[in-house]
Amino acid sequence: MSWQGSDPGRSRVRLRATLQGLLLGWISVATAAGGAPDSGAAVGPVPEALRTALKLDPFYQKHLDVEGLPVVGSAKVSDHALAEAAWILRGMLPGRGDLLRAMAKNKVRLVVMAFNEYTTDVPEHRRLNSKVFWDRRARGVGGTPQDPVVSCGEENLLGYPGDPYSTESILIHEFAHSIHKNGLRTVDPGFDERLRAAYDNAKARGLWPKTYAITEPGEYWAEGVQSWFDANRENDALHCHVNTRAEVKEYDPKLAKLCAEVFGDHPWRWRKPADRPASERAHLAGFDPARSPRFRWRESPRRCASSGPSG
């Protein structure tokens, strides 16, 4: 008697193969048109093929594509925030469609949170422990191979009043983590060894003292990438004076070399939308900063619940 058709293990393998096929099919369709690195695209509903391939929660209602890599958000998220996120990814990785496609194949997606959504509103982040901590502190998560979801807040993308991280790009930092863990480990298996060597060299030389960058190799990389794109803070409790590409090159040449290997040394730099020329805001047509809402930590429902009723 044949038992193969009822074997749960084989059924799971077939299901995974089917979902992987759907995902690869979606990537092929999404990237077939090609286009310039800075080309824009319209925000639309989440394609059903993508929703099925990634098992996306109904929470996700909006979608934009970058070389097959999905940028998604709920119905609350501003279309301009999704467009800005896609614009930043293209600015970071011109000519690196191989990296974006590898990340897409590894099921990476970028989630933009609305200004009044919080970290554990994101379906894939709901299982995080200490929900109040995450909702009170984090406006972005970098993703891992086991949980390949990168997130950031629309207030940081568009420069809303009340943005608690207004002098840096959270997206660039968190996406750098995913580039490392979900992209470079696929397309450049030797990268981790070079990163560890650069990090060990920095520690031996006493670089980045008492900063977030020196805590471990992953943060060393993500902080370095932020500064490579002039998108970091400086001279505070977690940072030294280095927050630009020129300063990274001078201060830590080995880290600069890694950044140049991955991103190139092209002129694109991050700037807040309000500080850019009109030519770099075409994808934000119709966005009026004067009408932006204000971000407030206190509006997290889990934080409010933990505080109890006010007297």
Give the ranges of each region predicted by the language model.
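Alpha-helical and His/Cys-centered functional microenvironments
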Residues: 8, 24, 177
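Metalloprotease/metallohydrolase-associated module, dominated by Zn2+-dependent proteases
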Residues: 47, 55, 72, 128-155, ...
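Acidic/His-rich structured neighborhood in mature extracellular/periplasmic domains
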Residues: 59, 68-69, 77-200, 238-241
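N-terminal low-structure segments adjacent to metalloprotease catalytic domains
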Residues: 32-129, 265-311
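Bacterial N-terminal signal peptides
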Residues: 18-30
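N-terminal secretory signal peptides that target proteins for export/translocation
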Residues: 1-15
